[in-house]
Amino acid sequence: MNAKNWPIVKVTLPADLKGIKPGEVPEFLLRDVKPHGKLHWLAADAYHAMRDKAFADGIKPFKPISEGDTYRSLAFQTTIFLQRYQKSPLAGASTRTWEGVKWYKKSPTLASLAAPGTSMHNLGIAVDIWSAYGPRFEWMLANALDFGFSWEVVPEEPWHLRYTAGDNIPAAVQAWLDRKKVV
């Protein structure tokens, strides 16, 4: 799929995240997601609604692979960043700037990573979906917007979705929430 066809929507933060430092989201704003990790409660509801729809449509598994694919504390983001980037220049390496210093990716085979405090994972509104290729990716492309998710970096990270709907619960998520109340 051509990257120009990928939906990239501007993020509207949930109101309860205003003033929260990235990577320091209070536990009461986070909710567990299956099978690993936590997301901001609005993003978690949207993720679970999307996951249930994916399952109903035969897209299995549909999940983050590890806790690092959801909310990341500042300490965790820093640890991963230091594993992937170094201060010593590397010819041809992609770079990130963190705290006014240029950092170089250690290997082109490593996935890129936002500098600590700048990732949507640090706010609990990003989720990385395992194996986002083929039918799974096509399903995501056709359905992610209905659940309030959009891409951020394409085509480098087809697995990386972020919740963009803020406090405006998408209709597909509200329908899922309503069905949960009836059951």
Residue ranges and their predicted role:
Residues 1-183:
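Cell-envelope/glycan interface and biosynthesis
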